[in-house]
Curated annotation (Swiss-Prot):
GO biological process, one term: regulation of carbohydrate metabolic process
Name of this protein: HPr kinase/phosphorylase
The keyword Transcription regulation appears for this protein: no
Annotated organism of origin: Chlorobaculum tepidum (strain ATCC 49652 / DSM 12025 / NBRC 103806 / TLS) (Chlorobium tepidum)
Region (Important for the catalytic mechanism of dephosphorylation): 280-285
Gene that specifies this protein: hprK
Subunit-level organization: Homohexamer.
Alphabetic keyword roster: ATP-binding, Kinase, Magnesium, Metal-binding, Multifunctional enzyme, Nucleotide-binding, Serine/threonine-protein kinase, Transferase
Amino acid sequence: MNFDQKGLKKRSITVAYFFEHIQKRFDIKFRRLNELDEQKCRIHERDLHRPGLAIAGFTKLFTYKRVQILGNTETRYLNHLSDEERKTAFANFVSFRMPCIILTSNNKLDQELVDMATGAGIPVFITRCSSTKTIYYITDFLDEEFSLYQQYHGSMIDVYGVGVLLTGKSGLGKSEVALDLIERGHGLVADDVVVVKRKGETKTLVASRNNIIDHFMEIRGLGVVDVRQNFGIRAIRDRKEVQVVVELLEWSKESEYERLGLDQKMVKLLGVDLPLVQLPIFPGKNITAIIEVVALNFLLKHYAGYVPAEALTERIRNVINKERAKAPAPSTSFEEYNDEND
């Protein structure tokens, strides 16, 4: 598997996509105040803007390409102005080509001002949520939409709560191993095509499935398996953080494989370092059980700081030190030295 693939990133999303999907993903509802072709309005930035200064007339540093949030402060400022001042201030505000305007806390906007936004081709939405809650949800949504992402060939499994990305050359049996893990009670996130996203500037990688393939698996010799229908809702996961990468390798006598586990290999995915476990495949090897142990070892190290290889090494070192302490010290007296040289 090529781990060096560069991450991809969306350049923009439509306001129509934003309006539809954010309400599905979060506990927030929006209502349209005007009717426009939202497919033509696009959001290019993940950051939001509170345009208080811009409404007041200072537009020198106005980041108008962002989603504009009008909360209590902005709407009350507009309401305290006279009719002519309000029209002038809002006309100046909507003269900039912004993606959309969102009113929070059910704040009202005069219909005349809404019509001005409609004339400028700017969608206006309203929500009952507070500005703080609205900004939190929208930022989280846009953060994910504009995150780095890449598609990897493999399987993503939730094993004992640990996100394991199973990779390797085609034909080595990744799907069969994943199916065996599902039968043992673990959860399938994705098979064949795994979509991995790096959330914002964090070191967190989140894996999800391809929406077309969904939770179907292709098993050679058997055909297509619907994991959800065959094993029930417990056998699938919507998304999972990638915590360990397991690479299946063809067995080779010439190759040297890790035997103790003291040297932890790492692999970089989308700029994030992850532990890599390479497992050679040969007849009679129970890969499923080994992957379960890989997950348990990760939990031991993550929560208890315990590494079996280091514990065994320390035990051997202690035994050697005890044996050395029991052995009689060699004599180095001056008389014995002279006797030996007479």
